[in-house]
Amino acid sequence: MTPSQKQYLVIDLKSFYASVECVERGLDPMKAKLVVADLTRTEKTICLAVSPALRALGVPGRCRVFEIPKNLTYEVAPPRMALYVERSADVYSVYLKYIAPEDIHVYSIDEAFIDVTPYLSLYGCTARELGEKIRADVAKTTGIPATCGLGPNLYLAKIALDITAKHSPNFFGELDEESYKLKLWNHKPLTDFWHIGAGIQKRLAAMNIHTMGQLAMAPTEPLYKEFGVDAEILIDHAWGIEPTTIADIKSYKSQSHSVSTAQVFDHNRDTEGARLIFKEMVEALTLELVTQKLVCSSIGIYIGYSATEVQMEELRQTGDYRSWRRHIPSSSGTKKLSYPTNSRDELMAEVLSFFDERVIPSESVHRVGLTFGNTREETGPGIQTSLFQDNTVLEKERQRQDTINAIKKKFGKNSLLKAMDLLPEATARQRNAQIGGHRSGEETNEA
């Protein structure tokens, strides 16, 4: 490493949810056969985590319960999202023993990027040694094993984690630009590389590009024609280049914001049942807008319908859920509002009208989503409301929403419910006891 060269560490907690459940049960996370899944849902429910021992036997990390081979014996743990959030915070506390917050970028609940460059002289060690020390402390403190990647930029550190470390006996990968070219320019498939999904891989294949080496050597003009400005990122990554730093990420402020929610039903709903769920989602999101003192100027809805029996039989035979799902019908759309608002009554009317316009009444609904887009501060510059709005009515509604928020914050989300939330098809009570759409593990406390 040259004096000016950065060193980035990426730490990924191995099969995090499964590892937490193993530790809670006194099991070895690397040896126990365990999956985290909510069996109260359908057989198509996704396993939120699969332990390393099961993955070593060929079970995919994000499979569905019915896809696990019947001849395997394993334990099923129901999701406890509140516990996982708590353990993630415990791990972050370990990072803070060694690194300042401004040099840590939390990428997800189980993964973090760390700029270790300023700390090597402080601790008198190499980047690899510091990474090993932090990883060992995480394991000692929480019992959770981790995989590490190390590189001179965020991209190479991530690739060292995703590809190199997973083929290393000690689960620690290191790459620089030269070793990246040497080891991975001929690596297949391209979808193993960060930010390259099946769609991009298919478009590159149509250009006869199947490896990073071929991408690096390809003429740039066709790439820019096909991918636009994103071609620059692809080309940089093919050469192992990534100029973005953690400081850049910390200082970035998105120009466009939104709040959203989505649900996948455990049993299909008819049109009226789905309409009820949209009402509940409007209630939840408008409270979120009011809490954050935001207004929105657009709405977006998504309605995904259920599969036919013929399609279900095809799935059972092929097991290819991802390609199968592309053939399932759906309705979606966005609508610009006449003026920015966070009024519950106004947004309810807009969303239900848009739902009635877009829904296919003859279809059973399996999943829904709602987004309030282009959010901004309600008192920010450029905010113009309608000349026909009754400010007295709006102020009374605001006071009502503030009161509801205060009660829910003090006594729990289920402390105050509307009559519609008690209907059989409603999901608000159940979802109020969830985190990220999954069981929190504390349902009995509030549900």
Pin down the residues of each PLM region.
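Residues that scaffold, gate, or flank divalent-cation-dependent active/transport sites
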Residues: 1-109, 113, 238
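DNA-contacting surface of Y-family translesion DNA polymerases
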Residues: 3, 10, 202-365
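Acidic, metal-coordinating catalytic segment for phosphate/diphosphate chemistry
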Residues: 20, 326-447
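Short acidic, glycine/serine/threonine-rich loops at helix termini
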Residues: 20-23, 46-50, 156-164, 228, ...
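Short Gly/Ser/Thr- and Asp/Glu-enriched loop/turn motifs at secondary-structure junctions
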Residues: 107-111, 151-154, 294-298, 363-367
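Catalytic palm subdomain of template-directed nucleic-acid polymerases
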Residues: 114-135, 208
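Long, highly charged, low-complexity intrinsically disordered interaction regions
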Residues: 129-188
